[in-house]
């Protein structure tokens, strides 16, 4: 691939970690990875309170176990997804096929947009359940900072994942333009739609015409050499 495609150089080059960490989409992946840790870590550690009267734990978000479960599930899965695509970022320059690079970038667009949607749903869900929580369920305000942190970083994650989708779409547009020649170019000699294929005979002797090509004697030139006499029988 001349000049590379889809945001990376030619395949087979040496791995450059410094160039990798400077990529905007790689930076956003690391930030999203950290945000996911904050979300599910906050809920797991301080999102469940002990009830003295009931003798069992309950979710800090309006006693709704689904709210805590959603936050933990989205956080853990986003954490794993970030690791997967960080590994893909490392391997991406080694992909030699333009079609495979295109598939990787398209999957990045779809997955990032999908996670931005999931974080939006999670933010709205947790914020709503936190708003309707009853003060009597938590009179000592235990874990309130962690609950707010999970909501805040769910909100921030919407933009980090949406940013990844936008950057992946830009890579797709740039890559499609740079890969256009390599995908659509056809050698004229192999194109069956052309009426004829050009042919140039290499020159092996002097050029009497001075035109830089070969010289051929016209077919109707008078031949002065005797060809012999054939007698006819009468």
Swiss-Prot record:
GO cellular component, one term: melanosome
N-acetylmethionine found at: 1
Domain (MARVEL) ranges: 20-173
Membrane topology: Multi-pass membrane protein
Keyword field: Acetylation, Cytoplasmic vesicle, Membrane, Synapse, Transmembrane, Transmembrane helix
Polar residues bias locations: 214-234
TM helices/strands, residue ranges: 24-44, 72-92, 104-124, 149-169
Region (Disordered): 192-234
Lumenal side: 45-71, 125-148
Gene Ontology BP, a term: regulation of short-term neuronal synaptic plasticity
Cytoplasmic side of membrane: 1-23, 93-103, 170-234
Family according to the record: Belongs to the synaptogyrin family.
Function: May play a role in regulated exocytosis. Modulates the localization of synaptophysin/SYP into synaptic-like microvesicles and may therefore play a role in synaptic-like microvesicle formation and/or maturation. Involved in the regulation of short-term and long-term synaptic plasticity.
Protein name per the record: Synaptogyrin-1
The encoding gene: SYNGR1
